[in-house]
Amino acid sequence: MHIIKPSWLSHCGEQKDFEVYSCHVSPDGKRLATAGGDGHVRVWSTESIYNANTPDYNKPRQLCHMSHHLGTIHSVRFSPNGRYLASGADDKIICVYHLDKNPPAATFGTNEPPPIENWKTYKRLIGHDNDVQDLAWSYDSSILVSVGLDSKVVVWSGHTFEKLKTLPAHQSHVKGITFDPANKFFATASDDRTIKIFRFTSPAPNATQHDMVNNFVLETTISSPFKSSPLTTYFRRCSWSPDGNHIAAANAVNGPVSSVAIIERTRWDSEINLIGHEAPTEVCMFSPRLFHTSKPDPSVDDKSPSLVTVIASAGQDKTLSIWNTNTSRPVVILQDLAGKSVSDLAWTPDGQTLFASSLDGSIVVAKFSEGELGWVAQPEENDKALQKYGASRKGMGIAEDVDGLMLENQSKAGESRAVESRMGALMGDLPDSTKESTPVTNGTKTTAPTSKPATNGQSEAEKDKEPEKEQEKEPEEAADKTAQRVKELKSRVTVGKDGKKRVAPLLVSSSGTGTSSLPQTQLVGTTSNNKAAQNDAPQTTLDLAKPFDGLPKGGIAAMLLGNKRRLNLGEAEEEEEPVSKRAATGPTTIVTNGHDSVEPAALVPVQHGVVPTPEFLRPAVMNPSIAFAQVRLAVPKIRSHVLRPLDRGILQGESSLEDASKTPENIILEAKNDPNPRDPSHVLVSKRGALIWEEWLPRAIILVTATKQFWAVACEDGSIHTWTPAGRRLLAPIILESQPVILEARGHWLLCITAVGLAHVWDLKTQSSPSPPVSLGPILDIATTSLNQHSATPGPGVTSAHLNSTGHIIVTLTNGDGYYYAREMFTWQRLSEAWWAVGSQYWNSNDSSISALQSTAVGPASKEGKDKESTKATVSSGIIPFLERHTTNEFLLKGRAYGLQRIIKMVVQRKEAENLESSVSIAHLETRIAGALQLGAREEFRLYLFTYAKRLGAEGARVKVEELLNSLLGGILEENEEEEDEDDGHGWFSKEGDLCGWDRKELLKDVVMILGKYRELQRLTLQYAKVLDISLEDGPVDVEQMDVEA
C-alpha cells in the first residue's frame, strides 16, 4: 500500500487551505472531482496524482475549476454514464456540468492555472430551501437525488433534469444518500436518527412529475442502530455494497460505542456492527468491486474462491479503517490521516485506490497492490450477484419478500410475449436491442449511425462516401453566397418621408428551421423502419389520414351567421374588424434562422425536376350558396401545381410534399392548372419520372388526394373525380353543394368538407355513405350569439380534418379542441380541450407511456386470424394522444392558458374546492376511457383503464371502484337464459363479448390485481378475486407489466 499526499492537491487560499467537503472519481477513473469551502469544484487528473513523485512527469495536474456556486460546496458526484458532474452547495442550488468539446477560455483576474478541459454548467436545479448536503445518481443515470438541511429528498430526472418528486419523509436534516446497485431502492440518512428506504422504478427519459405519483414509495424505516447517535456529525454518508446485500450506515451506535451499522437487505435490520472508531463516523464507502479471498486459478473452472466486499470508513477520529466481510477485524487502520475530520471517501472503478478528503484541506490517496485487499473479481461477478434482485430486468419490480412473491405468482403467463408487445413497451420493458436502436429524448431528433451490410467486400456505407463528399461541397459554396446576401440585407438603406436615411429592420422567421420539443407522431404506413430507427424522437402509431399541405398555418378561417343578439349590448361598443380586412399572410419574411446565423429567405430552387409549391393563380369562383349558408369556410385558391405522393406520405426529416416527391419509390399525383381559366386542367400520375396515366378536366383543380385503392381530385365547380390506380374512372363525377375546402382519404374511405361546412364521407368500396352530410356548425360555436343578427362573425378555424381506418371523422380547431363524429349517435363528441390541459394531473403531451414508443399491439388471443387481430389493434390508434398534443400546441404554447390557470388556482384555494384538481384528473381519465371506447382504440383503452383503476384505488373511491368492477364483469357469470326482449347494450352496458377488443375476464383480472394492494378496498376486490378463481397457484403474473405510471 502506498500513501500519496501531494502538496498541490488542495483547495488553496491566500492565507490557508480551504476545507474539502467532497470528492469523487469519474467512471473511467481518469478524473478526480473535489469540492471545497472556496466555492470551487476542481477536476484533477488521477494520472498526475499517481505520478506526484515522478520528476519527469509534466502533464497537467488540474484539468478544470468551476466557481458557479455562491458558498461552500458540500457534495460533488459524477454520473455513472460519465456524461455529467453534479455539485450541491449551501446556496440551495445544484449545478450540473457537462464536458464541452470546444476549447476552454482563460479566466480573467485569477491566479488559477488555465483550464485544460471545458466543463460548462448544463443546468441549475432549484428545489431546496436550505443547504444541499449530499447527492447521488442512480446506477443507470436515470435520476439524480439530492438531500439537504431542509429535510427534503428531491428527485430529479437524469435526462431533462426536471423535478420529478419531493419526498418530505424525514423530520430533520438529511445528510446522506446512497443507491442500490440493482436499481430498485435508494436509502437516505437523517438527523432524525433514521434511515429510510425508498423503492423506485427508473423513469422514462421524458417523464414528468405527473408520471411519478406512484413512484418513489417509502419501503421501510430503520431506526434501531441510531437511537442515541450524536447529532454533531457534518455528514451521514452511507453506502450500498456492490452485490446489493448490505447497506453500511455511518454514525451508528452499539451501546455507548460509535460504530458503522451493516443493514441487511430485505430484512432491513442490523445485526452486524463495525466497532473500532473512537468518535462518530462521517462517511463509509464500499469498494465498487468484489474481491476473491485467494488468487483464482484459471485452470480450475469448477471452484472459484469465495467473494468478499471491502468497505472503508472514516470520521471525526481522523482515522481511516478498511474492512472486508471475511474478517472481524479491520484489514488496514490509518490513524491521524488528517488534521481534522475526514469528510468523504471515493474509490476508483477498479477498486484498488481510495481517495479521502478532509476538513483540514488535504486530500489523501491510498493505493493498494494486488492481493492486499484481495484479488479483484471480474465485473461479471457483480452482475451475477445482482441477478437475484432483478438488476438486469429493468422496471420489472421483482418481488423481494414473501408477499411480493405471492403477488407475482398470481399473474398470468406471457412475460416474454409482453416484452415484444406494445403494452410491454408502454410499461418500459423494452429489450436491449430496441433501447439501443431507438433512444428516446424529449422531443428532439438526432440520428444514430447505422451499419449497412457489406457487398463484395465493400460496405454500402463506403459506397455512399463519394456522393456524400460531393454534397458536402455544395453547402460550403452556398455558405459564402448566403453570408453575402445576409450582409446585403442587413445594410439595406431606406429613405423615410422626412428625407432621413435609416437601415431597414429585418424580420427573422424561425418557422423554416425551428423544431418543436413535442413528440412527432408518425403516420401508419408512411415511415420506413430505417427512418424510424435513426430518429429518436418519440413515436407512436397513428390511425389517421395524411395531413393536407394546402391548409394555411392558422387553419381554415370560418365565418358564422348569427341567429340571436347578445344580451346587454352597449351602443358604444365597436364592431370587430372584419376578417377580410386583416392581412392574410402577415409581413413578408426577409431572412430566416439558420443553423449558425440568419439566412436569406430565398425561394427553394427546382430540384430533381420537381417544381416547388407555387403562388396561387387566382381565387376560386365562389358558389352562390355560400351567401345563404350559416357556416362559411375559406376556399383554397387556385394553384398552378398541386402534388400528392401515394400513401407513403412525408418521410421523417422531410419538411414538405416537394421533398417527399423526390423519393424515387413514391408515385406522384400531379395536377396542373392553366393560368387561363378557359383552358382544361391536366392530371398526371408518374413514378420515377415515367408517366403512368394522364387525363384532362374542364375545370380548375383545387385539391387532390390518393390511397392505394383510388385517386381523387376536387374541382372549382364543386365536383369530385375518382380513378382506380390504373387510371380508370371509378365513379361518375360527384357533385357537391359548394367548393371543397378539405379532401382526405384513408384506405377506401374518402372525406370532403365543403365551403358551407358540410362533411361528406363515402365508402368507395361499397359505393355508399355511412351517414348523411354532417355539419361542422355545432363544433364551430354556431349556437353562440353574435353582435348582429344578419352579419357573419369569425369563429374558430379548422386546423385539420382526418379519417381513421373505419371512416370516422376527426377534426381539430384553432382553439385547441379536438372532435370526433359518432355516426351511431349522429353527434359530435369532444375528445380534447383546454380544460383538461390546465386542470388534470394526467395531461402530458410528452407522455412516455404513449408517445415515446412504437410497437405492435398484442392482446388476448382472438378467434379471428392474426392479420385481422393486427388490423383491429391499430384501429384509432394514437388519436387521443394526437388530439391532446394539438391542444397543447394551440392553447398552452401560445400563452392563452394563463387566465384559466389563474382562475383554477383561485378556486383551489377555497375550502369547498380543495379537491378540484383530483376531481378534474379523474374526470379527464374517464373522458379518455369513454373516447377510446367510442373510437375502438383498444391499446389506449387498456392503458387508460389501468391508470384509472390505480387512481381510484389511491383515492379510495369505493363506490366508483365497485361500479367499474361490475361493468367489467358484465355477463361473464350469467347464463344465456335471459329474456329475449331485452336489447343488448353497448360499451359499459354490454353484457357479452369483448370490451373494446379485449377479453372482459382478463381485463377484470388485471384491474383486480391493480386494486389488490389498497387495503381499504381489499374486502371488495377479494370477492371478485374469488369469483375469478384467482389463487396463489395460478401461475406467474407480471404485475409490473399491468402497472401504469400515473
From Swiss-Prot:
Annotated spans, Disordered: 426-497
Source taxon at top rank: Eukaryota
Location (main, coarse): nucleus
Feature: compositional bias, Basic and acidic residues: 460-497
GO cellular component: chromatin; HIR complex; nucleus
InterPro entries given in the database record: CAF1B_HIR1_beta-prop, HIR1-like, HIRA-like_C, HIRA_B_motif, WD40/YVTN_repeat-like_dom_sf, WD40_repeat_dom_sf, WD40_rpt
Alphabetic keyword roster: Chromatin regulator, Nucleus, Repeat, Repressor, Transcription, Transcription regulation, WD repeat
WD-type repeats, residues: 15-54, 68-107, 127-166, 169-208, 230-273, 292-333, 337-378
GO biological process: chromatin remodeling; DNA-templated transcription; regulation of DNA-templated transcription
CDD domains xrefs: WD40
A GO term, aspect molecular function: nucleosome binding
Signal peptide: none
UniProt-annotated location(s): Nucleus
Biased composition (Low complexity): 444-455
Function text: Required for replication-independent chromatin assembly and for the periodic repression of histone gene transcription during the cell cycle.
The family this protein is said to belong to: Belongs to the WD repeat HIR1 family.
Name the UniProt record assigns to this protein: Protein HIR1
Organism classification: Eukaryota, Fungi, Dikarya, Ascomycota, Pezizomycotina
